[in-house]
A protein has these predicted regions:
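Glycine-rich, basic loop-to-helix element that forms the pyrophosphate-binding segment
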Residues: 62-78
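Short aromatic/hydrophobic "clamp" motif used to bind/position activated sugar donors
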Residues: 83
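Catalytic core of nucleotide-sugar-dependent glycosyltransferases
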Residues: 184-190, 197-227, 231-270
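Membrane-interface aromatic/basic loop that binds lipid-linked glycans or pyrophosphate carriers
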Residues: 249-334
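Conserved nucleotide-sugar donor-binding catalytic segment
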Residues: 125-206
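Short, well-formed alpha-helical segments that are part of the catalytic scaffolds
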Residues: 10-24
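Conserved donor NDP-sugar-binding/catalytic core segment of glycosyltransferases
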Residues: 95-123
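A conserved acidic beta->alpha catalytic loop
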Residues: 21, 36-45, 87
Length: 334
């Protein structure tokens, strides 16, 4: 059996499409755990309507406590051999669960990654050498890992980044990881999403980045991971905090805070990372590692790599000089 977890909060407009895509799966042995996180619209009524028609649907009705608390409740109530999540405003193809299940069985995987989730190529997020972090709905997890390790839960009072922390920690316990590139997850980006709002609020993001580092610092220390897994922590810093540093419209003070936080944690990380492993980092991130101050970092970026970041028509824009011409990037995408 596979457990499917759907966290629901005020999504009456999208919920039916989500539920229809899950109950219509070609793989039928499902338990569908719907956590109603204190919705104030008709979401609960829709869940109850569907639960009457399909006995596989279980509703957990609770006061609003946030994404992490809701997903943790779902984990505690899951009875399947595997677990995956679908956001309540998204939907999946009919063969989604079947493909992931067959992949896990074929490869004896503890963890299967939906490699083309939301048009993101996640292939370089997890390798034999290191891992960084993944979005919640790109993960297909063997439940025994979560049942045997009660410490592996979503961190409370962290958003955005709660899924990054959770996935990073769970992957430490996964012996076999595989990718599935045929399973299609349809991500619906909409106004009012809690995570999107948190990401847009740069000042909030600064506080969250500090929490990310504190949580993982403690996790690495408790599990004696510094000597063996520091490269993974460095990749987490690069793909989560450094990406935000490069693309978000921080104030000058907040930008300096994020820089200093990254430098402080990297001092602890990089003493356990070999120079040979720098091949896994971007040139810009190596500049950060080798810079002592934010002024020095931007000097290196500007003159060594001809990279300038600024605001242009109220959008985050980068300009890079390459092959005698300038390229304009929005959020580092052409």
């Amino acid at each position: 059996m596979i457990s499917v977890m759907i966290l629901v909060y005020n999504v009456e407009k999208y919920l039916r499409d989500c539920l229809n895509s899950v109950i219509g799966q070609t793989y039928k042995d499902l338990e569908i755990i719907c956590i109603n996180d204190g919705s104030t619209d008709n979401s609960l009524s829709i869940l109850e309507e569907y639960a009457k028609k399909d006995s596989r649907i279980r509703i957990i009705n609770k006061k609003n406590a946030g994404v992490s608390a809701g997903r943790n409740d779902g984990i505690e109530n899951a009875n399947g051999e595997y677990l995956f999540c679908v956001d309540s405003d998204d939907y999946i193809d009919r063969d989604y669960a079947q493909l992931l299940y067959e992949n896990a069985k074929k490869n004896n995987s503890d963890f299967v990654i939906v490699s083309n989730f939301n048009s993101w190529n996640l292939d370089k997020r997890v390798t034999k050498k290191y891992h960084s972090a993944l979005p919640t709905c790109s993960m297909f997890i063997k439940m025994s890992i979560l049942k045997e390790n009660k410490n592996l839960r979503y961190p409370l009072n962290v958003q955005p980044g709660e899924d990054a922390i959770f996935s990073h920690e769970v992957l430490m316990y996964a012996k076999n990881v595989s990718y599935e590139d045929k399973a299609n997850y349809h991500y619906i980006k909409r106004e009012g999403q809690v995570t999107q709002n948190a990401i847009k609020n740069a000042s909030t993001l600064v506080k969250q980045i500090e929490k990310w580092f504190d949580i993982l610092d403690e996790f690495y220390t408790k599990n004696n991971l510094w000597q063996t897994k520091s490269l993974s922590f460095a990749k987490f810093v690069e793909q989560e905090a450094f990406l935000a540093f490069r693309t978000k419209n921080f104030t000058q003070d907040d930008e300096r805070k994020v820089f200093d936080m990254m430098k402080n944690i990297l001092k602890k990380i990089m003493i356990n990372v070999n120079k040979d492993d720098y091949q896994y980092f971007s040139k810009e991130f190596i500049c950060l590692i080798e810079s002592n101050t934010i002024k020095e970092y931007y000097s290196i970026i500007k003159y060594k790599y001809n990279y300038i970041r600024f605001r242009f028509f109220k959008q985050n824009v980068s300009i890079r000089y390459k092959e005698n011409r300038y390229k304009l990037y929005k959020n580092d995408n052409i």
